[in-house]
A protein has these predicted regions:
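Flexible, glycine/charged-enriched surface loops at secondary-structure junctions
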Residues: 35-41, 201-209, 233-246, 341-353, ...
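Glycine-rich phosphate/pyrophosphate-binding loop and the adjoining helix
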Residues: 134-135, 140-191, 198, 343-346, ...
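N-terminal glycine-rich phosphate/adenylate-binding segment common to multiple enzyme folds
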Residues: 47-159, 163, 270, 274
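Glycine-rich phosphate/nucleotide-binding loop
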Residues: 256-355, 359-366
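Glycine-rich phosphate/diphosphate-binding loop of Rossmann-like nucleotide-binding domains
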Residues: 6-25, 29, 154-247
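N-terminal alpha-helical transmembrane segments of multi-pass membrane transport
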Residues: 2-6, 18, 22-23, 28-52, ...
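N-terminal small/polar loop signature for handling phosphorylated ligands or for N-terminal nucleophile
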Residues: 46-60, 222-263
Length: 403
């Protein structure tokens, strides 16, 4: 069989623990036998990030700017325990946060729907895509513990040295404060990404903040979205037969639960972080979720939305077989191949991506699945298999589809 050609490489970002193990399995079983793979490789495993003082993460993001499409494995964001475990020089920041800040993109996450894995919210019939702003707010915040009585203020000093002050709180005892920010250019980019993605996918776009309480911070998000919609997208939305809808975040949550799905829900950074996990879990599993970072200048980074599956990795290191779900990582690769094919005019690469996803879904719907899915499936013929057996079953179906 002639391998499917590529012309421009993907940026490949390797990762940590069990997902790193699955990464190699997926390449060996589902990619390298079928695709003449071209990638520019970056090792984002924690040890190498530590060796390079995290420069490898910056380099991988800049390579994504150069080539336009990246695929990323799940990575460890170290805490105090990881500092000790890996003997790190520093508690390095989240690679995802670093990459998002450099690309200034929006993260779109949507569930992978399969028969036999039914949403916990019974009226959900269609996917709900979460669009998460990927810059600023609490993720770039400065915090301080207040030891005792005193006054805290927000201070803005302009270039002429003139100060504007706002009282935060007069403390009568110990407390805490936090200062967070965002920038208009990033919010504008977020809005454009959301409106374009809604038009590309022909879905309604919902956006929600708490502007009634946060009358300057959140209200700025609301105003920017409305201005950009009215100026740049209203006509196109009406022509496409789709709707832009704004509401308060608490009302949005209630509406989401009552809905049947089938729309994009744009969220600020923290809201998107929380709600994407809620939506993924309610649809079945974090391992059954697509995730893509879309930058305003047309770069795409595909990844799995879950962690590195530490518990399974320790079992794997003991020589035990695990039943770890690789679906989100498979769909990260397929998404990257499809986008690379679309950008480079490679129809066969797009077709391979479609068939890789179809083979994965067909395998699950036939009853062959990993332990996390067999625990929640409604199928009567479910068979729990190891990760290797699952990938082998997908390969058999993929070979038949590509024949």
């Amino acid at each position: 069989m002639t391998k499917i050609a590529m012309t421009i490489p993907l940026v490949e970002m390797d990762g940590d623990e069990m997902t790193r193990v699955l990464w190699k399995m997926i390449k060996d079983e589902l990619i390298l036998p079928f695709v003449d793979l071209k990638t520019e490789y970056y090792d984002l495993g924690l040890e190498y990030r530590d060796q390079t003082r995290d420069q490898v993460t910056v380099d991988s993001a800049n390579a994504t700017k150069k080539y336009g499409v990246a695929v990323k494995c799940a990575t460890i964001t170290p805490n105090a325990a990881r500092m000790t475990e890996y003997n790190l020089h520093e508690m390095w920041k989240s690679p995802n946060g670093t990459i998002r800040a450099i690309l200034d993109g929006t993260v779109f996450r949507a569930p992978i729907l399969v028969k036999g894995v039914e949403p916990l919210v019974k009226n959900w019939k269609k996917p709900i895509t979460i669009a998460r702003h990927a810059y600023g707010d609490v993720y770039k915040a400065t915090e301080m513990k207040i030891p005792g009585p005193g006054k805290t203020e927000l201070v803005y000093t302009n270039e002429a040295g003139e100060e504007t002050r706002e009282l935060i709180h007069n403390f009568t005892g110990a407390g805490i404060i936090q200062g967070q920010h965002n920038v208009v250019a990033s919010i504008e980019n977020f809005a454009h990404c959301c409106f374009r993605y809604a038009l590309d996918t022909k879905q309604d776009l919902w956006f929600a903040t708490k502007d009634t309480i946060s009358k300057k911070y959140d209200h700025t998000f609301k105003d920017i979205f409305q201005e950009i919609y009215d100026r740049d997208y209203k006509e196109a939305f009406e022509k496409a037969g789709i709707e832009y809808f704004y509401t308060l975040i608490d009302d949005a949550v209630a509406r989401v639960i009552r809905s049947e799905g089938g729309y994009i829900w744009a969220c600020k950074n923290y809201d998107g972080d929380v709600m994407s996990d809620m939506v993924a879990t309610a649809f079945g599993s974090l391992a059954m979720m697509t995730s893509v970072l879309v930058s305003p200048n047309g770069c795409y980074e595909y990844e799995a939305a879950h962690g590195t599956v530490q518990r399974h990795y320790y079992q794997y290191k003991e020589g035990k077989k695990t039943s770890t779900n690789p679906v989100a990582t498979i769909f990260a690769w397929s998404g990257a191949f499809r986008k690379r094919g679309e950008m480079d005019g490679l129809e066969k690469l797009c077709d391979y991506a479609d068939k890789l996803e179809q083979a994965t879904i067909d395998t699950i719907e036939s009853g062959i699945m990993t332990k996390d899915l067999s625990a929640i499936t409604t199928l009567s013929n479910a068979q729990t298999v190891t990760s290797e057996e699952f990938l082998s079953a997908i390969r058999s179906r993929l070979e038949a589809l590509l024949a």
